[in-house]
A protein has these predicted regions:
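Acidic, low-complexity intrinsically disordered regions
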Residues: 2-248
């Protein structure tokens, strides 16, 4: 196998843990029931103490999505100062539970490299696929508990250009959940609107709530229902009620 940095089409600076073959759909109408979901999850050192909550919340969300109607392809990118691809376009029904072997906190926060690399990869897959193979919906869920501080390949302006292009040309959805930062302001620097960004309480309860709400939002997109501006209402209310960020 060639060294990763010489291989084509994958995320930049990523270690690939579980890559699925691209699914080719025979029925040209099947794309109407197909959703591409990309999770970009922070596992930098500041997430220490929330590993179990993150793993449990993610697994619970995936189990809920397995029961939903339609097809879904899951990609999961874990990032610290580098990115690691845990799932690469894997059918949701084939996703195994995340474990503490998969999610181990460490390092800094190369958020922009994780976002930019994932958009580049998924965009290329769609670009070279037959029209009938391109998922009807594509949704990115980005979660971080700190400021960008380690990216080398992408800057905020480049990521903003990429996100705005995918939103305008292909209707991709991007959700941004942030702690210890002004999530709305940070998201705006990346081309993500205030109605798609939310501050969350980075403790056990807040992490669990994140995944509950995100699962509801994904289900809405999968059934082609408009994602309303109040998708984040429960997270907003929790953050305002409990005020700020405390690890438990």
């Amino acid at each position: 196998m060639r060294p990763l940095h010489k291989r084509k089409s994958l995320y930049y600076d990523c270690k690939v843990r579980n890559r699925a073959a691209i699914i080719f759909w025979e029925d040209k109408h099947m794309r109407k029931n197909l959703t591409e979901i990309v999770f970009i999850l922070d596992r930098s050192g500041s997430m220490s103490g929330l590993e179990r909550d993150t793993i449990g919340g993610f697994n619970s969300m995936i189990e809920q999505q397995k029961k939903a109607e339609g097809e879904a392809l899951i990609s999961t990118v874990l990032f610290d100062n580098v990115s690691e691809v845990l799932h690469d376009r894997v059918n949701v029904k084939d996703i195994r539970p995340m474990t503490d072997r998969d999610y181990t906190v460490r390092g800094c926060t190369a958020l922009l490299d994780a976002i930019g690399g994932a958009i580049h990869h998924i965009g290329n897959v769609h670009k070279y696929a037959r029209p009938e193979d391109v998922p009807e919906h594509t949704m990115f869920v980005i979660t971080t508990d700190g400021m960008e501080n380690a990216s080398r390949r992408y800057n905020s302006e480049k990521v903003k250009q990429m996100i705005e292009r995918q939103k305008a040309k292909y209707g991709w959805e991007f959700l941004f959940l942030g702690a210890n930062i002004d999530a709305v302001e940070t998201a705006s620097q990346f081309g993500i609107g205030a109605d798609r960004a939310v501050n969350y309480q980075c403790d056990s309860e807040g992490t669990a709530l994140n995944y509950e709400v995100v699962s509801e939002a994904i289900s809405s997109v999968r059934c082609s229902a408009p994602l309303s501006a109040d998708w984040k209402k429960r997270i907003d209310e929790d953050y305002k009620k409990r005020g700020g960020c405390k690890h438990k």
